Amino acid sequence: MEKQNLIDMEGVVTESLPNAMFRVCLDNGCQVLTHISGKIRRNYIRILPGDRVKVELSPYDLTKGRITYRLRTKSSNP
């Protein structure tokens, strides 16, 4: 049951705020206040500043969003 009018973007978490809120800098330079989606919360996926994430934005309010996926970082360990 995916909503079709959402905007998907990628960005980097810049700040961790109380109540599982995060400030994300999107690839286009905008700062967005985001919260975690239910699947990330349920699976205990930890989000830290510096992580690259996918964000869903509503076309009605482009200043708030929801983190839907944490992208893998390229680490030096195999």
Curated annotation (Swiss-Prot):
A molecular-function term among this protein's GO annotations: translation initiation factor activity
Record function comment: One of the essential components for the initiation of protein synthesis. Stabilizes the binding of IF-2 and IF-3 on the 30S subunit to which N-formylmethionyl-tRNA(fMet) subsequently binds. Helps modulate mRNA selection, yielding the 30S pre-initiation complex (PIC). Upon addition of the 50S ribosomal subunit IF-1, IF-2 and IF-3 are released leaving the mature 70S translation initiation complex.
Domain of life where this protein originates: Eukaryota
Species whose genome carries this gene: Anthoceros angustus (Hornwort)
Residue ranges constituting the S1-like domain according to the UniProt record: 1-72
Cysteine disulfide partners in this protein: none
UniProt-listed InterPro entries: NA-bd_OB-fold, RNA-binding_domain_S1_IF1, S1_domain, TIF_IF1
Gene3D superfamilies assigned: Nucleic acid-binding proteins (2.40.50.140)
Keyword Manganese: no
Keyword Ribonucleoprotein in annotation: no
Name the UniProt record assigns to this protein: Translation initiation factor IF-1, chloroplastic
Keywords carried by this UniProt record: Chloroplast, Initiation factor, Plastid, Protein biosynthesis, RNA-binding, rRNA-binding
Family: Belongs to the IF-1 family.
A GO cellular component entry from the record: cytosol
HAMAP family: IF_1
Subunit architecture: Component of the 30S ribosomal translation pre-initiation complex which assembles on the 30S ribosome in the order IF-2 and IF-3, IF-1 and N-formylmethionyl-tRNA(fMet); mRNA recruitment can occur at any time during PIC assembly.
Localization per record: Plastid, Chloroplast
CDD domains: S1_IF1
